[in-house]
Amino acid sequence: MSSKPRTRSSKKPTLIIYGATSYTARQLLAYLDTHPDSVSFDFILAGRNQQKLEQANNKLSQSREVVACQLDDPDGVRSLVAKGDIVVNLAGDECAKTGKHYVDLCGESSWLATDIIPRYNNLAIQSKACIVPSCGFDSIPSDLTLYLAHKTLQARHPVLTISASQSFFKMKGGSMSGGTIQSMYSVAELPKDKRRSGEHDCIPKDGILPKTRSTILKLSYIMKIPNKARRYGSFFFMYPYNRTIVRRTQYLTNLFSGSNSGLASDSGSSTPKYGKEMKYEESMDIGRGKIGSSIFSFCLFFVFGLFYASKLIRKLCTYILPKAGEGVSDEQLFKASYAVTNLSTSTPLPDGRTVQISTTFKGQGDPGYLNTCYLLAESALALTLDKDKLPIPASKGGLLTPSIAMGDVLVDRLRKSGKFEISSEILGEDSDKKID
């Protein structure tokens, strides 16, 4: 490991950005460099190539500490992790050992289910480190919309939970990132006994949640919001992964609600309680109606089927699809946006009626490249700068989800960033029902 020190206040909380020379990291560094809270924290650029790290550092408004470190160098990784308060995008094992928080953009349930949760969850609990994967477009919008739907519902009806929930994703521009495509390659190359695609793969079989079958993937989906036109959606390619994070949140709320500490924090905020049984679906609204959505889904199933079944097809795709580290133009990055609409239905009231909650989550910028950097950065800053406001589960540590580890703190940071519009309301009831 080689390090080139810069002027850095040791008193400030410090983020370690590993992989700081990647395409996505370029957007992340620019966001952190000009962040309104930048006087309150420092960050270190880390990666494998000293020269490229220096080049990335030269583009910042002020010089930062640069550390070149190989991941197969345990002493180097240990020394690097010791320099900061939170690691962004690497070294989850060393963080779990030393009690340092960690966030990343993981989108591989197989990796979480077979390698990370079994090996590091208990270790992180012992050290009180928050290990929080999937802090980007995969899967914060999915996790937080359902979290807010529960918060909105239980602010009016504390004993109710959500029995069914669906989210529609609407993209304006945007592209599939090279990192996401690389994750697909990684999963496809795994031995069959290590592949995971079930929505309950990231929760233990300890009886806290009942055994349920995974939701069947469909060609088309329909969303019926009262007094609005019906919306039809197609299969959303990140749904199989996003649902594993949603299910882990569901599991953790039930786990913590049964503990002595509960779910309320000292700051007065609390994590909502999820029910033990809940149907969850996601879809992509392509604006083509039921038939068009069904055809699009069929094409996706066919293409993905070929991709995962044939090494030859995957080899050909390497010449067509973006590679990790590749991206689109800055103009395309900033023009793109997305909107997530979640419609959730409660368990029955005593009179048999149910309550519906509508939650929206809108983000600026290409979801796979630019917006995901905003989400990742604010997640890291929430764990670093707002420790006293975090939910109780964050003080316990472990392999957590964004809503469990950060909850309202993350929602507030996203709103204040100016890059997101987030709201949630109960439908069909009187005032005092909206969270925004």
Please state what every model-predicted region is.
Residues C106-A129:
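Rossmann-fold NAD(P)-binding glycine/threonine-rich loop
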Residues T14, D85-I86, H101:
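Structural motif
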Residues R6, A25, K128, I140, ...:
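C-terminal catalytic/substrate-binding lobe primarily of soluble NAD(P)-dependent oxidoreductases
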Residues K12-H35:
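N-terminal Rossmann NAD(P)H-binding glycine-rich loop of SDR-like oxidoreductase domains
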Residues V67-I86, L90-D93:
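Conserved Rossmann-fold cofactor-binding substructure of NAD(P)-dependent oxidoreductases
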Residues A46-Q50, Q70-L71:
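N-terminal Rossmann-fold cofactor-binding loop
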Residues A56-S63:
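Short, conserved SAM-binding/catalytic segment
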Residues P36-I44, D412, G418-F420:
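A generic structural motif
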